Design a protein with these regions (language model features):
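Positively charged n-region of N-terminal signal peptides that target proteins for export
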Residues: 1-4
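Bacterial N-terminal signal peptides
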Residues: 8-20
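Short S/T/G/P-rich N-terminal loop/turn motif that feeds into the first structured element of a domain
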Residues: 24-111, 118-251
């Protein structure tokens, strides 16, 4: 049988619980998710895909950002790395909002110019989809630079949360200082929600690739001879690096 609180004590207790719950909700950072499509493209035609994105897709992503359907977006071009040639991302506070935005924007693009959309799809005719959740950093909220370095990790699934804690404890202060010094525009650590084999994503952006690579070298130097850095490597021991040109993005 449930006990019902009555009178002044009951009201006071309820108010305390209410305000405690509100305080916890305010203290807890908002969830942020990214839906990223990594494209395999015809390398002889990939610049045409960039043109189509600018001519057709971009205005709909700008509008979705302006009306808060999405929290950010970006179109990335491969510079160095694996087989992905282009990447398209957009953010939202929930997974359902991500899926809804994908459906809405895709329908708008096809309705505007199905022929051009199909041409884009033929150039980049295969892809891998991932949903990431932000764990640390500001990459889902900050205006990014024109160049990005992303590392996609394969990790020990039993120790992924330990890797997250190490990033917050060891890596975050280094990245934050690089941002404070103007050497980075953004950085982020994200966890896998849906997608392929990669379990964690570390990404940073800057004004240009030279600046980003210098920042990355600073991070590596700061972690040299740090046993916690070695522990992180034990957990996430395999990775693939990509250097991206951020061709279009918001914010």
């Amino acid at each position: 049988m449930r006990k019902l609180y009555t009178g002044a004590f009951g009201l006071q207790a309820c108010l305390l619980l209410t305000f405690a719950g509100l305080a916890q909700a305010q203290d807890k950072p908002k969830d942020a998710y990214l839906y990223v499509t990594y494209f395999y493209c015809d390398v002889t035609q990939q610049e045409r895909a960039d043109q189509i994105f600018d001519q057709l897709d971009r205005s709909f992503y700008d509008a979705a950002f302006a009306d808060a359907t999405i929290t950010n977006y970006g179109w990335l071009a491969h510079q160095t790395g694996g087989k992905w040639r282009r990447a398209l991302y957009n953010g939202a506070p929930t997974i359902q909002a991500l899926l809804d935005s994908q459906k809405k924007i895709g329908a708008q693009i096809d309705a505007k110019n199905k022929k051009l959309s199909d041409e884009e799809g033929k150039i980049c005719n295969s892809h891998d989809d991932y949903i990431w959740k932000a764990v640390a950093g500001n990459t889902v909220t900050a205006a990014r630079g024109s160049a990005a370095f992303s590392t996609y990790y394969i990790c020990d699934s039993n120790r992924e949360k330990q890797a997250d804690a190490l990033v917050k404890q060891v890596f975050a202060p280094i990245y934050d200082k690089l941002m404070a010094d103007g050497k980075l525009k953004s950085w982020g650590w994200l966890e896998h929600i849906v997608g392929g084999e990669y379990r964690r994503l570390a990404t940073m952006s800057g004004a240009d690739m030279k600046t980003v690579l210098e920042a990355r070298a600073s991070v590596n130097q700061a972690l040299m001879d740090n046993p916690l850095g070695d522990t992180f490597t034990d957990i996430c021991g395999s990775h693939t690096d990509y250097m991206w040109e951020i061709k279009y993005s918001k914010p």
